[in-house]
């Protein structure tokens, strides 16, 4: 049995991550355990948690209650912005891979993963559209397109 732990949040739900986990090309049967990290906060409150992680790293916020127990048997961990703390990694002797669906990795204890030679995959989905939009704004402004002259 392959065990995947997923941690959803206010932007990417645990259900979405669980669906993605079931599509992975990994040994079956697959058991997915779902956690929610501050999914019940309003936008401003959630942004404060994100800001804290971005400024102080994954150890600066609480991890979901009970997750350390499930990490003991976890083969894979999938998150969005939820912290991947040193304690979570230390609790997971079977961990083969951590996946995060965002460009930044400030929410992950990268040094601990390196120490244990556990791969980290981070999916960057919006880098190209953001660059396109930025260049479009640049042209619109420098050529006065928005002002029609």
Model-derived features: where do they sit?
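N-terminal glycine-/charge-rich "phosphate-binding" loop or analogous flexible N-terminal tail
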Residues: 1-74
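Phosphate/diphosphate ligand-binding glycine-rich loop within oxidoreductases
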Residues: 75-149
